[in-house]
Amino acid sequence: MAAKIRREDEVIVITGKDKGKRGKVKNVLSSGKVIVEGINLVKKHQKPVPALNQPGGFVEKEAAIQVSNIALFNAATGKTDRVGFRFEDGKKVRFFKSNSGTIK
């Protein structure tokens, strides 16, 4: 089955502590989760690595978020949108359901 959300897609969080925030998808995990830039930040403890001259302490990084908690952002309408699939010139492409615009 083709993925409705892919890397580099612009998405909006629709539920949770980061509701309403927008970001780009950095990674899509096979477990039904995605990592989005600047969304769902968590603080991790990091040990110092003297060989690499890395200090220890707290590091903020993005944690995975369920794909059901995000929606694709349609720049043409300025809102979230649903995704459909269709064939154009023998290739399967994604499109926005509200205005039928093809997604890059």
From Swiss-Prot:
Pfam families: KOW, ribosomal_L24. Keywords: Ribonucleoprotein, Ribosomal protein, RNA-binding, rRNA-binding. It comes from the Bacteria. InterPro entries: KOW (IPR005824), Rib_uL2_dom2 (IPR014722), Ribosomal_uL24 (IPR003256), Ribosomal_uL24_CS (IPR005825), Ribosomal_uL24_KOW (IPR041988), Translation_prot_SH3-like_sf (IPR008991). One of its GO terms (molecular function) is rRNA binding. GO terms for biological process: translation. GO terms for cellular component: ribonucleoprotein complex; ribosome. Belongs to the universal ribosomal protein uL24 family. One of two assembly initiator proteins, it binds directly to the 5'-end of the 23S rRNA, where it nucleates assembly of the 50S subunit. One of the proteins that surrounds the polypeptide exit tunnel on the outside of the subunit. HAMAP family: Ribosomal_uL24_B. Part of the 50S ribosomal subunit. This is Large ribosomal subunit protein uL24. It comes from Buchnera aphidicola subsp. Acyrthosiphon kondoi (Acyrthosiphon kondoi symbiotic bacterium). The gene is rplX.
